[in-house]
């Protein structure tokens, strides 16, 4: 943390090791949320956040990011804070859109946290996976924020070990202690051999992270070109993460779910309907117009998907999903 973000962290008191980021996030929520507390979430967002909040008795309050660039409206955000707001969840780089929150946006979020005395809970699992010279910054490094931020992250995405379940929360000592106590009562301990492996992984040379970004950037560009060739509207180029959030072709009459079903049946290609990431105003038509594509696949898998799309185009047998 000192080398990457310039933060002083006491490893004995400020870090809680958990079974993946998911447990670290859930434990963070359980450690600070009481019945009726409000938690701000950006919409769209990763679907498990809401469940953790409601399970803890909290109330999710959604702040929509505006498509197609997924911009943050400062006034809308500030209006969402109330005396009941206990925390705000910040995932950057962002799942599903690939957005990296800018320094200006982080400053706005931090101002709301300081003004309303609430906690920022971050999900930074894609912190090393950014593109086009974008840089990830943690909100904890801003003035007055380290003492009111709980950072959660893991090995899973950076080192492609999603099954190892090694994650952590970095927080002020009192919060880290509460998170550790919750972790002990739920899963007892993260696997010790994997913790040893984690130390080796986290000491990887900078060249590893640069190579990782380069490989995924090529895969991102490959998928953008592929989807563009069959009519998808790619109006936002992912700045980070492993996902492409693409809008259905303009002339497509299907919903996101219907399109995904057709794609599976006719091409054998699987993507995720976008509506599962939206939780706010369901009257917004765009919420049923997106799909999420994961490009963290082998070259062989991506080429096979491209071939299947190509066969559909050449056969002209699939007017519902090829435009």
Per-range role (PLM):
Residues 2-323:
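PLP-dependent class I/II
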């Amino acid at each position: 943390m000192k080398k990457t973000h310039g933060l002083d962290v006491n490893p004995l008191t400020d870090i809680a090791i958990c079974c993946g980021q998911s447990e670290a996030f859930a434990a963070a929520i359980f450690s600070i949320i009481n019945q009726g507390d409000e938690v701000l979430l950006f919409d769209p967002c990763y679907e498990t956040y809401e469940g953790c909040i409601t399970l803890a008795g909290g109330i999710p309050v959604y702040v929509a990011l505006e498509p197609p660039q997924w911009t943050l409206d400062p006034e809308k955000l500030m209006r969402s804070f109330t005396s009941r707001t206990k925390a705000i969840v910040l995932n950057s780089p962002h799942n599903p859109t690939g957005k990296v929150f800018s320094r200006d946006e982080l400053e706005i979020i931090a101002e709301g946290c300081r003004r309303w005395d609430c906690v920022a809970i971050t999900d930074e699992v894609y912190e090393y996976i950014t593109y086009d010279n974008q840089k990830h910054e943690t909100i904890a490094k801003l003035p007055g924020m380290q003492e009111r931020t709980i950072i959660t992250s893991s090995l899973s995405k950076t080192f492609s070990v999603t099954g190892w379940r090694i994650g952590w929360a970095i927080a002020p000592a009192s919060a880290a202690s509460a998170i550790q106590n919750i972790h002990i009562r739920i899963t007892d301990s993260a696997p010790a051999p994997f913790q040893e492996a984690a130390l080796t992984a986290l000491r990887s040379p900078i060249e590893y992270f640069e190579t990782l970004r380069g490989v995924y950037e090529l895969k991102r560009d490959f998928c953008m070109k592929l989807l563009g060739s069959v009519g998808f509207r790619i109006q936002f180029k992912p700045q980070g993460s492993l996902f492409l959030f693409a809008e259905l072709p303009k002339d497509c009459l299907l919903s996101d779910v219907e399109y995904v079903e057709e794609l599976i049946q006719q091409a054998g290609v699987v993507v995720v309907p976008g509506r599962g990431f939206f939780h706010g105003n369901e009257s917004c038509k765009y919420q049923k117009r997106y799909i999420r594509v994961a490009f963290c696949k082998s070259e062989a898998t991506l080429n096979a998907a491209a071939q299947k799309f190509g066969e559909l185009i050449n056969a002209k047998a699939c007017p519902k999903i090829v435009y």
